Design a protein with these regions (language model features):
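Phosphate/dinucleotide-binding and metal-coordinating scaffold of catalytic cores
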Residues: 1-211
Length: 211
């Protein structure tokens, strides 16, 4: 179930249902608007590949997830964190590494820090996916520890080795939702605002933060 939690809504509203199917390594997605959403917000187009009418709609063959949801997907840094977490878990559990889809990336991101205004549930009366009463976004005062963790992860990438789980665990929730390739994480400042902290990279040949 897909909910809109846009800043101009008084409370989250159910938009529709997103479905996902993987067959022989090929992913397909379906979406169906709820009648109530179309009645109240039928003039609002969420994506150029979704028409505002009732009934099931599907992504075209060879196309990934609908555009409005792809905007919330992590970029290279976030995908690296999620991929490495899956590889470490697979090693610990003595199983094959799962091929992660856009759907896995979408729901693998922490609910509070996910880019955009979409929220997801597996059942109408359930909790939002990957949401927790204990906020997983660290305070700004943890910045040095986060920088150290990002440096260790970059080092392991250079050496083509898996990082320690403690470094991934420290960054995967606050860092996986953000775009771009540079190491970064979401943090909460002293005024409880959600901010983006960009870190130095081992690949930097100048002080990118100072620039």
């Amino acid at each position: 179930y897909v909910f809109a939690d846009f800043d101009w809504l008084k409370e989250p509203r159910l938009i529709g249902e997103l479905s996902y199917e993987s067959l022989r390594g090929s992913d397909s997605y379906g979406f169906c608007y709820k009648d109530e959403w179309l009645k109240d917000y039928g003039g609002l187009f969420l994506s150029d590949d979704l028409n505002n009418y009732p009934g099931q709609q599907y992504t075209t063959p060879g196309k990934d997830i609908f555009g409005c949801f792809s905007d919330a997907l992590p970029d290279r840094w976030g995908r690296t964190l999620i991929n490495r977490r899956e590889q470490i878990l697979a090693k610990d559990e003595k199983r094959l590494v799962r091929r992660l889809s856009s759907f896995d990336y979408l729901i693998g991101i922490e609910d509070f820090s996910r880019m955009g205004g979409f929220r997801f549930k597996e059942s109408m009366d359930g909790e939002y996916i990957n949401a927790s009463e204990s906020l997983h976004i660290p305070p700004l005062t943890d910045i040095r520890e986060l920088i150290a963790a990002s440096s260790e992860i970059e080092k392991s990438e250079e050496e083509d080795q898996l990082p320690e789980m403690r470094w991934i665990a420290q960054l995967v929730q606050p860092g996986s939702s953000l775009g771009g390739a540079r190491p970064k994480a979401s943090v909460i400042d002293e005024n409880k605002n959600l901010c983006i902290a960009k870190f130095p990279s081992r690949k930097d040949d100048y002080d990118a933060g100072l620039w």
